[in-house]
């Protein structure tokens, strides 16, 4: 349990510490909502320093379909009208790892009951949503990668100028000194 709590705390710390104190940062969160990412998403939405302009789903803690459903369910819980785009269902090159149901439960949210959402994800893919949003707001949108970075790689393949138009990319990218995201693809 200590490793899991440390992992959650590190995720939230990295998310909030990455942004300046004075400016409200506009972000797209690219996420595989398990219990840890769900907490980070809710903290970001509640923060007066962050404006979440979109959520993208990705495989990782759960499969992409469930990640999309979980993102929509979380947004309904807090009555947040934020668009959700469904992302890649597999890595570009590496073998897809099994989902850690022993940590996040079969539903990805720790087996707590959260009502299904009546909302749907955008018709755009996550990569298309990233490109459209960043290129329409050059230098204003940051990307927060809480899961695998496949959607960001696909967005860069669609629009190489994305690299010079995104404000910054903040990636969780693994853990230190605790069990967790310590694999060759973390």
Predicted regions located by residue number:
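Contiguous, function-dense segments enriched for cysteine-driven chemistry
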Residues: 9, 13-14, 64
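A glycine-rich helix N-cap at a beta->alpha junction
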Residues: 78-85
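Surface-exposed loop and adjacent secondary-structure segments within mature catalytic domains
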Residues: 85-117
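Bacterial N-terminal signal peptides that target proteins for export
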Residues: 1-10
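Active-site histidine-anchored catalytic micro-motif
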Residues: 24-30, 35-73, 106-108, 112-186
């Amino acid at each position: 349990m200590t490793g899991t709590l440390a992992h959650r705390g590190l995720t939230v710390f990295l998310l909030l510490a990455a942004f300046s104190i004075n400016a409200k940062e506009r972000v797209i969160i690219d996420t595989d909502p398990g219990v840890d990412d769900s907490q980070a998403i809710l903290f970001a939405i509640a923060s007066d320093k962050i404006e979440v302009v979109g959520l993208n789903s990705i495989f990782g803690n759960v499969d992409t379909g469930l990640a999309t459903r979980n993102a929509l369910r979380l947004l309904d819980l807090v009555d947040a009208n934020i668009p959700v785009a469904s992302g890649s269902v597999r890595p570009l090159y590496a073998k897809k790892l099994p989902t850690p149901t022993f940590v996040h439960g079969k539903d990805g949210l720790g087996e707590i009951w959260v009502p299904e959402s009546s909302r749907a994800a955008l018709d755009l893919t996550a990569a298309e949503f990233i490109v459209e949003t960043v290129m329409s707001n050059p230098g204003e949108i940051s990307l927060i990668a809480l899961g695998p970075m496949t959607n960001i790689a696909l967005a860069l393949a669609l629009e190489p100028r994305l690299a010079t138009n995104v404000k910054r990319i903040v990636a969780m990218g693994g853990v230190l000194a605790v069990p967790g995201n310590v694999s060759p693809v973390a």
